[in-house]
Swiss-Prot record:
Its EC number is 2.4.2.18. Pathway: Amino-acid biosynthesis; L-tryptophan biosynthesis; L-tryptophan from chorismate: step 2/5. GO terms for biological process: L-tryptophan biosynthetic process. Keywords: Amino-acid biosynthesis, Aromatic amino acid biosynthesis, Glycosyltransferase, Magnesium, Metal-binding, Transferase, Tryptophan biosynthesis. The keyword Nucleotide-binding does not apply. PANTHER family: ANTHRANILATE PHOSPHORIBOSYLTRANSFERASE. Belongs to the anthranilate phosphoribosyltransferase family. The lineage of its organism: Bacteria, Bacillati, Bacillota, Bacilli, Lactobacillales. Its cofactor is Mg(2+). It comes from Streptococcus thermophilus (strain ATCC BAA-491 / LMD-9). This is Anthranilate phosphoribosyltransferase. SUPFAM superfamilies: Nucleoside phosphorylase/phosphoribosyltransferase catalytic domain, Nucleoside phosphorylase/phosphoribosyltransferase N-terminal domain. GO terms for molecular function: anthranilate phosphoribosyltransferase activity; magnesium ion binding. Catalyzes the transfer of the phosphoribosyl group of 5-phosphorylribose-1-pyrophosphate (PRPP) to anthranilate to yield N-(5'-phosphoribosyl)-anthranilate (PRA).
């Protein structure tokens, strides 16, 4: 580690291979907590690069639990979190609608860290076994076209990094790595990101990881979701090209929804919100969900524009298809 620390202290970027080698040791519990904290803080001060992000992701995937069946067409819409918006579980709600639209969703997530209810917490209330075995996850992906991929189950070696992250108490490169470390080789991705200035770096990492198409979204006030107030900024990876764009609720012909109107609660309250959306009950929650689903369909290529994606989202909720996906997952991922 001495040579690595020296290189970082000289503000020299690390190669993918260097970072992957360091994390391979970390994930084998061969590096002390203080060294891990120093490494993460050093990268943060220097400024993280796409190669460094990719190196960590590849190390994590090499230590991840493997599913018995291979899927090459999956998508994830997991975000970084950490935006302090305290909104309801938007991407978790959206994943059922995306799956209803024919996209195989490998929805990664975790328990609450900075909010009252993480994706794992709300799905548990709904009777879904978030810690299901790899065999059950494969069955769900095959039969339902949707599975919840629990970070703690699929990345057990991450426990060696947790204490250092908690001791630091600030966002590090690990916040960027989480949504990218899905154990499946994703074809497409919608990733919420809490800092606009990191979008290009993350987009380059996503490209290196082999995604066919992806959108990285940062909402107003650095939300890691799209919102119906202010300006949303997204970076699109398409056909090997990376470009940045903006849009507002007015561009889509939608009504304004303030952040205070989509505040979430605890896991039980957020489960009720999720159900109300899938039942097509009119609310700011429904409007925010269809916006993010529309963006997901655009990220996947299922819709040519975000607006087309929003219309498809409305249809799938209105006809009960999205709610049916939840019912099927409740039957299979148990």
């Amino acid at each position: 580690m001495k040579e690595i620390f020296l290189q970082i202290s000289n503000r020299q970027d690390l190669s993918q291979d260097q970072v992957q080698a360091v994390f391979d040791r970390i994930l084998k519990n061969e590096v002390s907590e203080s060294q891990i904290a120093s490494f993460l803080m050093g990268l943060k001060i220097k400024g993280e690069t796409s190669d460094e992000i990719t190196g960590i992701v590849r190390a994590l995937k090499s230590h991840a639990t493997v599913l018995p069946e291979t899927f090459t067409d999956a998508m994830c819409n997991c975000g970084t979190g950490g935006d302090q918006s305290y909104s309801f579980n938007i991407s978790t709600t959206a994943c059922f609608v995306l799956a209803a639209g024919g996209i195989r969703m490998a929805k990664a997530g975790n328990r609450s860290i900075s909010s009252k209810s993480g994706s794992a917490d709300v799905l548990e209330v709904l009777g879904i076994n978030v810690a299901a075995s790899p065999e059950i996850l494969s069955k769900a992906l095959d039969e339902v076209g949707l599975a919840f991929i629990f970070a703690q189950t699929m990345h057990p070696a991450m426990r060696f990094i947790g204490p250092a992250r908690q001791a630091l108490g600030i966002p590090t490169i690990m916040n960027l790595v989480g949504p990218l470390a899905n154990p499946l080789d994703l074809e497409t991705q919608l990733m919420g990101l809490y800092r606009v200035e990191l979008q290009e770096i993350v987009a380059n990492a996503i490209q290196q990881l082999g995604r066919k198409r992806a959108v990285i979204i940062t909402g107003p006030d650095n939300m890691d979701e799209a919102a119906l107030y202010g300006t949303n900024t997204y970076t699109l990876l398409e056909d090997g090209h990376i470009s940045q764009h903006t849009f507002t609720y007015e561009d889509l012909g939608m009504e304004k929804v303030e952040l205070s109107d989509i505040t979430g609660g605890d896991a039980k309250e957020n489960a009720e919100i999720l159900l109300s959306v899938l039942r097509n009950e009119a609310s700011p929650y429904l409007e925010t969900t269809v916006l993010n689903v529309g963006l997901g369909f655009f990220a996947n290529g299922k819709a040519g524009t975000i607006k087309e994606g929003v219309e498809l989202a409305r249809q799938l909720i209105a006809d009960g298809s999205a709610l049916e996906k939840l019912r099927k997952l409740q039957e299979v991922q148990v």
